[in-house]
C-alpha cells in the first residue's frame, strides 16, 4: 500500500488514467512505474470487469472549486508480482507530480481497512478476488 502525499494516513494502490491508444493493462503498468518507479514486476491477473465508485458530496465540493466535474471513477484492476527490492521504490522519479510519500507491505485483505470510506467496497471486491490468485501464484514460485 502507498501513502498519499499531502494527506494524513490515506493509503491506496497506484491508479491513474488511460492514455489514448493504451489498453488498461499497459496503463496500469505505466501508472505503477510513474508513481513508484517500480519496474520489476510480472503481470499475474486482472479483475474480470471494471468497477466504479462515486465520490461523496464533500469530495465533489472540493473538486467543484478546482474546476473538476467528474463524479466518480471507473477502474480496471491488475495484479502484479513485485520481484524487485525495496530500494527500487522511488516517489520522486516524476517530481512534477508526487503521488505518494510512504509505502508498507501488508496482507491484501488488510487493504480495504486502510482506504478512504468511498473506496472500501471496490477494494473489498478486488482484494477478495486477488487473494485467491495470490495464494495459487505463491504456491507456484
Where does each model-flagged region fall?
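Active-site micro-motifs of SAM-dependent methyltransferase domains
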Residues: 9, 34, 113
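Charge-dense polyanion-binding interfaces
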Residues: 128-141
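N-terminal strand-loop-strand
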Residues: 1-14, 39
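Functional cleft and adjacent loop/helix regions within the main domain
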Residues: 14, 20, 61-65, 140-141
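Tryptophan-centric aromatic hotspots in well-structured domains and transmembrane helices
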Residues: 11, 48-53, 77, 100-106, ...
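NUDIX/MutT-family hydrolases
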Residues: 74-81, 88-122
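Active-site-adjacent beta-strand/loop module that shapes the phosphate/pyrophosphate-binding cleft
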Residues: 51-89
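The catalytic Nudix box helix
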Residues: 13-49
Amino acid at each position: 500500500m502507498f501513502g498519499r502525499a499531502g494527506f494524513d494516513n490515506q493509503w491506496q494502490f497506484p491508479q491513474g488514467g488511460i492514455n489514448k491508444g493504451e489498453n488498461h493493462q499497459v496503463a496500469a503498468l505505466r501508472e505503477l512505474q510513474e508513481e513508484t518507479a517500480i519496474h520489476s514486476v510480472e503481470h499475474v491477473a486482472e479483475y474480470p470487469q471494471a468497477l466504479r465508485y462515486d465520490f461523496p458530496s464533500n469530495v465533489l465540493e472540493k473538486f467543484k472549486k478546482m474546476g473538476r466535474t467528474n463524479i466518480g471513477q471507473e477502474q480496471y484492476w491488475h495484479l502484479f508480482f513485485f520481484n524487485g527490492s525495496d530500494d527500487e521504490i522511488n516517489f520522486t522519479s516524476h517530481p512534477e507530480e508526487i503521488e505518494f510519500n510512504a509505502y508498507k507491505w501488508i496482507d491484501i485483505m488488510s487493504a480495504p481497512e486502510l482506504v478512504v470510506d468511498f473506496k472500501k467496497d471496490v477494494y473489498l471486491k478486488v482484494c477478495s478476488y486477488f487473494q485467491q490468485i495470490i495464494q495459487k501464484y505463491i504456491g507456484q514460485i
